[in-house]
Amino acid sequence: MIYSKYQAVLVIGFTILSTLKLLKSVRFWLAGIFALLILIPHFHWQLANDFPSFQYHLVDRSEGFKLGCLLEYLPNQLAVFNPLTIGAAVYIMFKNKPSGQFERTLYLQIAGFIIFFFFIAFRGHVEPHWTIACSVPLIVILTQKCRTDPRILRYTRKFILPTLLLFIAARIFTLTDIKFIRHLAFGGKEQEYRELESEAGDLPVVFSGAFQRPSMYSFFTGKEAVAISSLYSRQTQFDIWQFEKKYNNNPAFVCINPLGNSAIYASDTIKFGGYRTDSLQTVNRIKISYDIKQKDFHPGDEVNVDYIMTNPYDFNIDFNHRHFPVSLNIVLVKGKELYLVDVNQENQVTMIRAGETVSGTIHAVIPVLDEGKYSFGLSLNNAFGPSLNSRFIKIIIRKDD
C-alpha cells in the first residue's frame, strides 16, 4: 500500500488512532516489522538518490500560503467525490454515532483525510486526488446505511446512481476522436508527436521542463527522449535516470522555445520550436558548493562568494560551446519570482575537464528588488535555463534607510 501511495501512512495512522489497542497486539507489530522489511529496497533507493520523493513533496511543492489554494480545496473535494455522494456520507456521519469499532475507524479515515489535507492547503496546492483513499470508507458507510435506512436508499437510487451513469457516459465520450475533445487535450496526441518525429528523425529528442512531453513522445514513437529540468520547472524522474549523459557530445534534436537557433515548425495540429545539434551539452549534474558570510543585504551592496565547482561527467564542459554556452550566475528566488544576477569571476572558467574540480571567487551587486527574504544559490545557465547546481540558503534584502 505504501509502495503505491505515501498517503497509506495516513490510512495506517488513522486506523491506529481509532483503535489504540492495536498497539498491544503482537500480530500488529509483527505485521509492521514485516512491512518495513519489504520497504527496505525503497528506503535504500531514497537514500541513494538524496530522498527525491520527500524533497519534491515537502520542499519543492511548498508554495507558501495562498488564499486561492485554500479556497479551491473544498470545491475540488466535492468534484472528486461527487457532491451528492460525499454530502450523503457527511449527513450520515453527523446524524449517527459510529455503532462499533469498525465504523469508528471508517469515520476517522474520512474526517482525518479531509482535515489533514485542508491544513496542507495552507502551504500550497493540494492535488484533488490525494484524498481518494477515503473513498473506500465513504462507500462502505453509504452502502451499510442503504441496508437499514429506506430514505438513504431512495436518495441513492434517485440522485447518486444517475450521476454515476453520467460519469460513465462522459468517460466513454472522452475516448472518442472528436475534434472538440482533442482540443481539450483528452486525446489526439499521437499525430502531434508523429509530426515531431518526422522533423527529429532518428535523433533523440531533448525537451526542457516537465516530464510529460518526453514521456508521450517515447510512448507514441518508441524512440528516445529526455527532459532537462531547470529552476523554472520542478525536477522529475529524468533527473534520477540522467539519460542525457549518453547524448552529450552527440547529435540530438532540441525541442525548446524558439530562442537562438530554434526554428518554428507548424502544421494544423502542432506548433513547436526546435533545432538539430551535432553536439549536445547539458550541465545539470555539475555540483557547486559555496561559502557566503554575509546574509543581510541592501540593493547595490557587493556580494563576494567563494565557490567550488565539480564536474562529475566523463566528458569536458565547454563554457564557450557554440550551441550551448554556459554562464555562472547568482540566483535569487522569492515565491515564484526568480532573478538571475550576472557575476564577475576573478579567474574566468572556460572549461571544466571530466572529473575536474575548480574553485574561485565571484563578485556581484545585489539588484534593486522588493524587501524580504530570498533564497540564494549559484546556477549554471544555458539554453535549457538555469540548472539546479547548488544548495539554496536564505538571505534578507532590506530597503535603504
Predicted regions, residues:
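Short periplasmic/luminal acceptor-recognition loop of GT-C membrane glycosyltransferases, typified by
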Residues: 199-235, 319-333, 346, 377-379, ...
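Short amphipathic, basic-aromatic surface patches that mediate peripheral association
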Residues: 309-320
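Short, solvent-exposed, Trp/other aromatic-anchored flexible loops in extracytoplasmic proteins
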Residues: 340-385
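Transmembrane-lumen/periplasm boundary regions of multi-pass, lipid-linked membrane glycan transferases
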Residues: 11-102, 115
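Membrane-proximal, lumen/periplasm-facing interface regions of secretory-pathway glyco-
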Residues: 128, 153-202, 210-231, 255, ...
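Hydrophobic/aromatic-rich transmembrane helices and adjacent perimembrane loops
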Residues: 124-151
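Periplasmic/luminal catalytic loop of GT-C fold multi-pass membrane glycosyltransferases
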Residues: 239-285, 308, 368-371
